[in-house]
């Protein structure tokens, strides 16, 4: 029944959009004042996505264009419907943070049918003719996480707590992490006692997965957590087991995580400048809507095509460089962190 309903819904979406598919992709020539940008976000449950939304919207408006953001609360059907609504409203370009990398291919299909280009933001939409991808070097994120943990401990029982399996970035983080860990595993220095994705990036699920391991093995030497949310869940589990202070990685430089770094319960996070990402994406969105050429620095294969891509550099953050990184960049203030 569910499959039938989804099928009917998608058919309806395409039928509605068919009425307005009057121009081939890229043939419009608009001024900034005429541009209408649609921003479809997976969720606003995590702290960082509020920053993306606010910075992106502000930059689009500064460029003289209009923008509307819709968040799907982690629901694929809702995200497809929101994309459909924006297309029906006549957006000139669609920027998408996909909940599910595969299912979101339908959004690209609908947008192209309506003559609208699609930018995949932060997370890559797979198996679709995505027009442009902007993100960070996500394999490098995983490498940075492991490298910093190895500065503290390079032998023993390690856990890998990944992100959502439906998120292409989660796979890239893991690939980067394992590329550094593998030689240590091969020579027997490191034993992986947990290697699981975390449904929906949910900190509670990360905590549960960690607690299951700790119920059988109260000897964990380090945890590679894919982001700050999962790190928070892991640290709660470790603390309950009397293991607070075990090296734990993270990502996103969330305020709660940076405070944990100061307190010594989290070892590091990875700062990905949301200012840089959101502003860059906003400028590109307006340029694409105006049919201007975009310079990219590489391509990333999404299973179907080599997607023109712009990848920004992530930055590792520890207790030693908080002031030189996230505070200097204006992302957080000393008062935020230390009060």
Which positions does each model-derived feature cover?
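A residue-level marker of the well-folded mature domains of exported/periplasmic proteins
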Residues: 13-339
